[in-house]
Amino acid sequence: MILVIDNYDSFTYNLVHYIGECNQEIVVKRNDEITLPQIRSLSPSKIVISPGPCTPKEAGISVDIVRESIVPILGVCLGHQSIGAAFGANIIKAPEVFHGKKSTITHSGKNIFQDMPKHYEVVRYHSLIIESSTLPDDLRITSTLIDNPNIIMGIEHISKPIYGVQFHPESIDTENGMKLISNFLNL
C-alpha cells in the first residue's frame, strides 16, 4: 500500500491517479489528520508527500515523516522541500516564481531518473526552492535546471531511499512524469 500525504494541494489527486495506474493500493491522508504511530500501524510500503501551498514548517507531519524515514519516500514540490528541511537545508524564495511554466532539466540517470532521456521538459509550480549552498552532506543533487545548475530540481539521500523533485511529475505537460512515478514505485 502506498500512503500519500496530502498537503492540501489540487495536484494531490493527479499523483494518486498516476500511482493508481501503476496498480498500487493507495491511502490518502491530509498532513494534519495522521500521526507517526498511525502511519506505522498502516504499514505502507512507500510514502509520497504531495505538493502544497505553504512552507515545510506549515506542512503538518511532512517533515517528521522524512525524519522518521520508515519506508521509501518520494517528495514532490513541497514534499521535496520538506526533505531538504528535514535534513537541515534552508528553504528560500526562488529567484523567479514559476507557476505552470516549463523548464528543461538534466539529471543523474539513476534511481527515479533511470531509463529517461538525459534532458527533458518539466512543469514547475513553485516560489520556494532548496538553497543549494545549504544542502547537507546526507543529501545529493540528482537534477538541476539545464540553464542554471544552482537551481535544484531533484535530490536523494545518500544512504536511505528518500527522493525529491521540485517539479511536478504529475503535470500532464511534464515529460516522463509517469515513468518517474513508476521508477519510484519499483525501487
What are these regions (language model features)?
Residues 26-31:
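Short hydrophobic/Thr-rich beta-strand motif most characteristic of the beta2 strand and flanking loop
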Residues 44-115, 181:
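Cysteine-nucleophile active-site neighborhood
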Residues 35-43:
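Short amphipathic alpha-helix with an adjacent loop that forms part of the alpha/beta core around
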Residues 102-104, 152-154, 164:
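Conserved hydrophobic/aromatic beta-strand scaffold that supports enzyme active sites
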Residues 111-160:
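Catalytic beta-strand/loop cores that center a nucleophilic Ser/Cys/Thr
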Residues 171-187:
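Acyltransferase
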Residues 77, 126, 168:
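Histidine-centered divalent metal-coordination motifs
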